[in-house]
Amino acid sequence: MLPRPLVPLAFAALLGVTAAAAAGPPPPANEVRGWLLRIHDAASHRNFQGTFVVSGGGSVASARISHFYEGPNQYERIESLDGRQRKVFRHNDVVHTVWPASHVAMIEQRGLLNSFPALLQAGDDGLGEWYEVQAEGLDRVAGHEANVLAVKARDGYRYGYRLWADHDSGLLLRVDVIGEHGDVLETSAFSDVSIGVRPQPESIMQGMRKLDGYRIVRPVLTPTRLDTEGWVLRRLAPGFREVSCVSRQIENPREASADPALPPVIQTIYSDGLTYVSVFIEPYRSDSHRQPMLASLGATLTLTQRQGDWWITVVGDTPPATLKMFAGALERKKP
């Protein structure tokens, strides 16, 4: 398991809920979208450094995170502290992922993938139909007083969340993903964090420039449509809609070379405004595609299956029913 800070930290500051609001009645459902937009804004406009830990499914992983902003510019560094060393540097939408041991660096533009923060601005006015939000008082996380908010799923197609946000700044300190039976599937939390630190953008830019001796990988992402690629999705899980569809030219950044003959993979991303489902479509290859499976790691489920001459992979932080609905609704268009 790897920390996924762009997802929990994009929630990233509890909606600007004040102490008075935390002690008051549950907020109206129509305020959900406004809260989430304030989360996104607070995540972008806090300078902080800390250690972030993700645990779930018997696995634990941690990363050191620094986030700075100056005017319109955002800077971020994420360094894994477990397993194979990996560093991620971000300046606005440009992301460099660096593997020091193999001297490989992957450079991509996050905006092309419509990552989670962008989804909050994509017109998700119906969030209150799918989630119920309740304030749950105060707690402490990583030495900081925090407001607690419960985001409860209204149906079986999505999970719920419990959020802890710093009382003074609104920065998200912890998020639990809550399963269908009320169990905690995954916890993402700061074990230590300093908020309001002096921004050091040059430390991020230096890391992005120091690539001498590295093999540079630049994934080729081409916007496309399912129907253009010969596919149709007959139905969507309730509340989900398509937010991105790209053709990805796959290259393994850990290998010294890649097979240029490998066909591109079609990736379509769907979201209900809080969570996401990714559908990958690629030609079936007997040497790499084995038995169909449904596997979980923390809150993330992965479903794979063969469909004729194609291999389908569906990934999401959702209950199995959601992934099965997407996989079952995907059909190859008739000539």
Regions found by a protein language model. Give the residues of each.
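Surface-exposed amphipathic alpha-helical segments
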Residues: 169-171, 178, 182-201, 313-335
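N-terminal mature ectodomain segment of secretory-pathway/periplasmic proteins
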Residues: 24-103, 129-178
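Short, solvent-exposed helix-to-loop capping segments enriched in aromatics
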Residues: 115-127
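Bacterial N-terminal signal peptides
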Residues: 8-17
